[in-house]
């Protein structure tokens, strides 16, 4: 059997009564599944992630000729994480196709991660026939209420009961992505609706009219007056400010205000910018410095404890907040002035209202320089080891590369100690904090920005959650993706936490596989450096060759 025939054979799935589904003949009528795919293409979707199944065949009928690339993942959770990475790097919504029931429950962790980190995902799934919903008939993949399963982790979860509802639901999803706090949307489509012919072709009915806007003049004036009067202003910016980098830099310079970021906001200022305080509000030197501010302007950040590693920041002055989500204005930190609107437009409006002459930034720059020195000096032995590795990564990393990270101790240190060179360049599962994110998110990021070299930082524990997606990477990628596997043969953070609480370590010392052999089995180039000099050379080599390079760095070799 030839390769093309083999791929065709693999695409076949089985029906609920175990009758083989044969390839359909060309049809003159347009099904809702076909029309939906065409509609997505007209919204600018160029990539979808998923695994075809018997319940989603009508979606896949629409893919050939649509201009949309389908990426076959090895697990629906991988599809969700890839869509997340794609969205974070490209700025466009990531799209998944998943089947009824187990496809939805498998992708749910990735949906939860995207919800926590305000990442736009569009998850389209099948669901059983309309007549069976809620009846408990024992249909294949049946759930009691599929829509309700994802409702708590989405901006909205909807059930389309007719083909004509689909363009309205897609328009509503893009209204969330464009005009609200971007979060996942899940649309379930019954099998009979997917296969139904459309009465009229709505596949070109794109309704996309972003409307974020700016706060009222009175609120802007009040904020500008407070900023102008502040003696020690400081800024905090998060993922909601990724499109406001120029305005943030101008405001920081005008006010001589140090700029802190959340993990999602890393890279908003260049690493060598004198007022770039980095994502350092999770360590004591950062806490001490922010306490000195008499006014803090927080832009596009929920100021969550997952960014600060403590319940509350020690703010002693007033707080002004800029956010698209009004629920953030009085969460834990009551706002003196609340500015609801688009981050970039709001900051530009503030700049117009502030004195045009920049303040003397020398004292603030000196304070930031001291902060950076204090962070390095405060490293415990493990963090000092991480810093040495991160320094080698920085030396080898191409200028336009991104880094996708997992929940691993090396990345925890990197969250505050690694200087990102640009926005959308450090991907981390901050809020939900799931393991297994780094590799598939890195693959999705590569597909969202194929011209950018990619690096994945993952620990041995998290790697095994989604290691099968190396098969996807080897099949789909022809430009450099380097996977740096930090292998300490342990669930290191949990082991350390147990020891810190005087708990005898249980379940934290797994017997790992031969990672080099595993990587080769998936078609990766494999390197195992014995020291940090070799690590830097291997990183450079990986970025210089096409495809996937797996670098296993054992803890003992990093000293």
UniProtKB/Swiss-Prot annotation:
GO terms for cellular component: acetolactate synthase complex. Thiamine diphosphate binds at residue 76. It catalyses: 5-guanidino-2-oxopentanoate + H(+) = 4-guanidinobutanal + CO2. Its cofactor is thiamine diphosphate. Induction: Induced by L-arginine in the absence of ArgR, via the AruR/AruS two-component regulatory system. GO terms for biological process: arginine catabolic process to succinate; isoleucine biosynthetic process; L-valine biosynthetic process. InterPro entries: DHS-like_NAD/FAD-binding_dom (IPR029035), THDP-binding (IPR029061), Thiamin_PyroP_enz_cen_dom (IPR012000), Thiamin_PyroP_enz_TPP-bd_dom (IPR012001), TPP-bd_CS (IPR000399), TPP_enz (IPR045229), TPP_enzyme_TPP-bd (IPR011766). Its EC number is 4.1.1.75. Binds 1 thiamine pyrophosphate per subunit. SUPFAM superfamilies: DHS-like NAD/FAD-binding domain (SSF52467), Thiamin diphosphate-binding fold (THDP-binding) (SSF52518). Keywords: Arginine metabolism, Lyase, Thiamine pyrophosphate. One of its GO terms (molecular function) is magnesium ion binding. Pathway: Amino-acid degradation; L-arginine degradation. Catalyzes the decarboxylation of 2-ketoarginine, leading to the formation of 4-guanidinobutyraldehyde. Belongs to the TPP enzyme family. This is Probable 2-ketoarginine decarboxylase AruI. It comes from Pseudomonas aeruginosa (strain ATCC 15692 / DSM 22644 / CIP 104116 / JCM 14847 / LMG 12228 / 1C / PRS 101 / PAO1). The lineage of its organism: Bacteria, Pseudomonadati, Pseudomonadota, Gammaproteobacteria, Pseudomonadales.
């Amino acid at each position: 059997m030839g390769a093309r025939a083999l791929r065709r054979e693999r695409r076949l799935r089985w029906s609920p009564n175990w009758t083989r589904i044969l390839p359909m003949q060309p049809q003159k009528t347009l099904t809702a599944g076909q029309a939906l795919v065409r509609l997505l293409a007209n919204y600018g979707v160029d990539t979808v992630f998923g695994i075809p199944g018997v319940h989603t065949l009508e979606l896949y009928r629409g893919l050939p000729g649509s201009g949309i690339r389908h990426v076959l993942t090895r697990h629906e959770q991988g599809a969700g994480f890839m869509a997340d990475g794609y969205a974070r790097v490209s700025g466009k919504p990531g799209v998944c196709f998943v089947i009824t029931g187990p496809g939805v429950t498998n992708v749910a962790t990735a949906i939860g991660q995207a919800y926590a980190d305000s990442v736009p995902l569009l998850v389209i799934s099948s669901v059983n026939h309309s007549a069976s919903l809620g009846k408990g008939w024992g249909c294949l993949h049946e759930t009691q209420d599929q829509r309700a399963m994802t409702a708590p982790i989405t901006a909205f979860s909807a059930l389309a009961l007719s083909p004509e509802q689909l363009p309205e639901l897609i328009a509503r999803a893009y209204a969330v992505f464009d005009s609200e706090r971007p979060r996942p949307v899940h649309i379930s489509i019954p099998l009979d609706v997917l296969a139904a012919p459309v009465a009229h072709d709505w596949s070109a009915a794109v309704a996309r009219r972003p409307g974020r806007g700016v706060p009222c003049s009175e609120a802007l004036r009040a904020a500008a007056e407070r900023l102008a009067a502040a003696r020690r202003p400081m800024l905090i910016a998060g993922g909601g400010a990724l499109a406001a980098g120029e305005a943030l830099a101008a405001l920081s310079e005008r006010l001589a205000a140090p700029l802190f970021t959340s993990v999602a906001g890393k890279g908003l200022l260049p690493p060598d910018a004198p007022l770039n305080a980095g994502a350092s509000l999770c360590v004591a030197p950062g806490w001490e410095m922010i306490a000195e501010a008499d006014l803090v302007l927080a832009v596009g950040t929920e100021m969550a404890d997952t960014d600060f590693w403590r319940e509350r920041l020690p703010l002693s002055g007033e707080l002004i907040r800029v956010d698209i989500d009004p629920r953030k204005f009085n969460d834990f930190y009551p706002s003196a002035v609340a500015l609801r609107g688009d981050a970039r437009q709001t900051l530009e409006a503030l700049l117009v209202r502030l004195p045009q002459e920049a303040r003397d930034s020398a004292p603030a720059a000196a304070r930031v320089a001291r902060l950076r020195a204090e962070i390095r000096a405060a490293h415990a032995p493990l963090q000092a080891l991480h810093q040495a590795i991160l320094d080698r990564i920085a030396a080898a990393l191409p200028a336009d590369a991104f880094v996708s990270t997992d929940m691993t101790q090396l990345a925890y240190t990197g969250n505050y100690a690694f200087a990102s060179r640009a926005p959308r360049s450090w991907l981390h599962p901050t809020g939900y904090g799931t393991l297994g994110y780094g590799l598939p998110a890195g693959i999705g990021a590569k597909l969202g920005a194929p011209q950018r070299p990619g690096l994945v930082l993952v620990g041995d524990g998290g790697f095994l959650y989604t290691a099968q997606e190396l098969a996807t990477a080897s099949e789909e990628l022809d430009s450099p993706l380097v996977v740096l596997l930090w292998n300490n043969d342990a669930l290191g953070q949990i082991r350390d936490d147990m020891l810190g609480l005087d708990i005898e370590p249980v379940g934290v010392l797994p017997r790992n596989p031969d990672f080099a052999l595993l990587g080769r089995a998936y078609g990766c180039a494999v390197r195992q450096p014995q020291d940090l000099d070799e690590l830097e050379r291997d990183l450079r080599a990986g970025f210089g060759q096409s495809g996937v390079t797996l670098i296993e760095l054992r803890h003992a070799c990093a000293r």
